[in-house]
Regions:
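Conserved N-terminal subdomain of the carbohydrate kinase-like
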Residues: 24, 48-128, 297-304
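Gly/Ala-rich phosphate-binding loop of Rossmann-like dinucleotide-binding domains
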Residues: 47, 153, 262
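Conserved phosphate-binding/catalytic region of the ribokinase-like
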Residues: 197-304
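Charged helix-capping and loop-helix junction motifs
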Residues: 115-118, 142-149, 195-201, 235-239
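Short beta-strands and strand-loop turn motifs
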Residues: 101-103, 128-134, 162, 180-185
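Hydrophobic anchor at the start of a short beta-strand
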Residues: 2, 51-54, 78-79, 159, ...
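Glycine-rich phosphate/adenosyl-contacting loop at the front of the ribokinase-like
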Residues: 1-56, 64-66, 304
Length: 304
């Protein structure tokens, strides 16, 4: 079974406004509402690819109810913990001459709520996959990812971590199955500027030395790199296409890698599927579908 954790899910309200101006009434030309959050994106793409997962995390109020409704409508199973104080956040994404975002805070998550999450994690068993993705709300301990991995260390669970800076490096001693920084985040960790794929491989191996089993590094238009636990190194150029929406591309890469690995047990195949899933989402207004991913795979095999 696959589980994803999104600590602070959102309802993303995306509006397109022609020539937006401050201080006057602006009218939208297009608007979209969808559930947001990195773990939620992973669960959504997994469902599109034919893999069931359960989305975990915390929701509150009428916004939380709508997040759950929209996910269930997409066929995504949810088991969010209801939080009594506050309301799940609404994030406004304004697209005009420039793109701007206003992100909400989210509910007040208390110790009792966190204990309920640990009780859910007790139900995980050998061979399960757990995806920890995104930031941690400031109302929760900053050590949350590390605490979860410590809590589960006696179980043979494949844990995937898609986070930045300390959230990522602090979990390395617990040997996560997969981590997915981008090239800029990788450079920030080591205080260097990453200039090419050879640099990526060099510093990805340093993360392996610190405990990561597999390191998948996205490089936007420059492609991606995988350094796997069996000593293999894989490089890929970026598939060719017109970028329409970069939101969720990294999460889609994680979902593609997980589904590819579970279906084949082969790191190269997982890497190919991850890269093409991430790109398929970037080339679409919405998150990638299985048909879009497979079509991109068929015409991109020369890139690997």
């Amino acid at each position: 079974m696959i589980y994803t954790v999104t600590f602070n899910p959102s309802l993303d309200y995306v509006v397109d406004v022609k020539d937006f101006k401050l201080g006057i009434v602006n009218r939208t030309v297009q608007e979209t509402i969808f559930p947001g959050g990195k773990g939620i994106n992973v669960s959504t793409v997994l469902k599109n690819l034919g893999y069931d997962s359960t989305a975990l995390g915390f929701t509150a109020g009428f916004v939380g109810n709508e997040i759950i409704r929209l996910l269930n409508e997409k066929g995504v199973d949810t088991d969010f913990i209801p939080v009594e104080k506050g309301v799940s956040r609404i994030n406004v994404k304004l697209r005009s001459n420039e793109e701007s975002e206003i992100n909400g805070q989210g509910p007040k998550i208390e110790e009792a709520d966190i204990k309920k999450l640990y009780k859910q994690l007790d139900g995980l068993s050998e061979g399960d996959v757990l995806v920890l993705a995104g930031s941690i709300p400031n109302v929760m301990p900053s050590s949350m990812y590390m605490d979860i991995m410590d809590y589960l260390k006696e179980k043979d669970i494949k844990i995937v971590v898609d986070a930045t800076r300390d959230l990522l490096t602090n979990v390395l001693p617990y040997h996560p199955f997969l981590i997915k920084p981008n090239n800029h985040e990788l450079g920030e960790i080591f205080g260097v500027e990453i200039s090419d794929k050879d640099d990526v491989i060099k510093y990805a191996k340093k993360l392996q030395e610190q405990g990561a089993r597999n390191v998948l590094v996205s490089m936007a238009g420059d492609g991606a790199v995988l350094v796997s636990e069996d000593g293999q190194e894989f490089k890929a150029e970026a598939p060719v296409g017109k970028v329409k929406n970069s939101v969720g591309a990294g999460d889609s890469m994680v979902a593609g890698f997980v589904s590819g690995y579970l279906s084949t047990g082969d790191y190269k195949q997982a890497f190919m599927y991850g890269v093409c899933t991430g790109s398929a989402s970037a080339f679409s207004e919405e998150l990638a579908t299985k048909a879009e991913v497979e079509a991109l795979l068929d015409r991109s095999k020369n890139l690997f």
